Amino acid sequence: MTATTATAPTMRGGGRNELPPHLDDNLLTPRFYTTEFDKAAKTDLDIARKDFEAMFKEMEADYNLKHFDRKASLERLSELSPEDKAIYESYLVRSVVSEFSGFLLFKEISNRFKKAGRQELGQFFTFLARDEARHAGFLGRALKAEGINVDLPNLGNKRAATFFPLSWVLYSLYLSEKIGYWRYILINRHLNDNPEKVCAPLFDFFEPWCQDENRHGDCINLMMRCWPGMTKGFRGKLLSRFFLWSVFLTHTLTVCERGDFYGLLGIDPVLFDEEVIIQTNNTSRNAFPWVYNFDDGKFLEMRVQILKAFRNWRESSGLAKPVALSKFVSLILRQFALPMQKTNAVRYG
C-alpha cells in the first residue's frame, strides 16, 4: 500500500527539504497509496445508514478542535544530549511524514467520492483528512521549535503511489489507526505516571491525538461492514491473518530497532510492543472475522525469537547471511500459521 519517492521534494523558494547532518535524509520519503476508487464510490450506505449518520455527526462535531491549541508552545521542556536530541527529532520527522501521508490519502479518497457524486462519503473522509492535517501541523511546529523546517505541501508534489485492492487498503487502514491509538494512549498513560520523562509539551497532546486515531479506526470499520464480502469465508480469514501478522511483525521489528526513543521516555520497548499487540488484537475483534489466539502465549513468545533472528541476519555476512535469513523466514512463517479465533464482529448484509 506504500511507495517511496525517489527524488527529494523541493521546498518553496527553490530549496530542498533537507535535514540536519545528524538526521537521515531517508526519513523524508513519504509513502503513498492508491486503490479502486471507482469501486469504493459504490459503497452501499443504505445497509449502515443509522450507524453512518451517527459516525458522521461525531466526526462533524470535531470534539478535539479546541484541544489542539495552535498558539501552545512546543518548545522542549528539558535540555537533551546531542544523541537524545537526534532521537527525538528523528521521531518527529517520521511522525510528520506519516501523518501527512495519511492526510493525502484521505483527501484523495474524499475528492474521488465527491467527483463520483457521493457527497456524504466525500465529506466523511474530509473529516479524517482534517484530523491528519492537524496532527501533521503540530508535528511540523514541534520540528520548527527544534530549528528544522519541513515543507509539508511540497512533500507531495512529486510522488509515486503503489496500487492495492480496496480490501487491502481498508484492512491495513483499520489496523494503522487502531495500533496508533494504542501506541499513543499507552505512551500517554506512562508519561502521566512518570511526568519527569516528559521532555516536550508535544506529548501533552497525545490524549486527544489517540481519540482521533480511535475514531478513524471506527470510520474505517464502518466502511468494511458495508462490504460484507471482505470479511466472509476463507477470504475474510486470510485477510485477517495476513494483515494482523504483517502489522504486528512490522511493529515488533520497528519498535525494538528504535528502542532508543522509548528508552528516552523510560519505556521498555519489548514490553511496550507486547502490550500494543495484545490490545490491538483484542480491539480488532470488533472489525475482523478472525484474530490471533494469544491464550497459549506462542505468538508473543515467538516475537523474541524473531527479533533475535532478524538482528542475527542483519549482522551476519558471507555464507552465514543466507543461513540466518532462512532461519528468520522460517520463524515468521511459523508465526503466521499460528491458530486464530473466530470473532463476533458486526457485519451488514
Swiss-Prot record:
This protein's record includes keyword Heme: no
UniProt-annotated stretches for the region Disordered: 1-23
Enzyme class: oxidoreductase
Pathway: Porphyrin-containing compound metabolism; chlorophyll biosynthesis (light-independent)
Cross-referenced InterPro entries: AcsF, Ferritin-like_SF, Rr_diiron-bd_dom
Protein EC: 1.14.13.81
Cell membrane recorded as keyword: no
The protein's required cofactors: Fe cation
Protein name: Magnesium-protoporphyrin IX monomethyl ester [oxidative] cyclase
Organism: Prochlorococcus marinus (strain MIT 9313)
Gene from which the chain derives: acsF
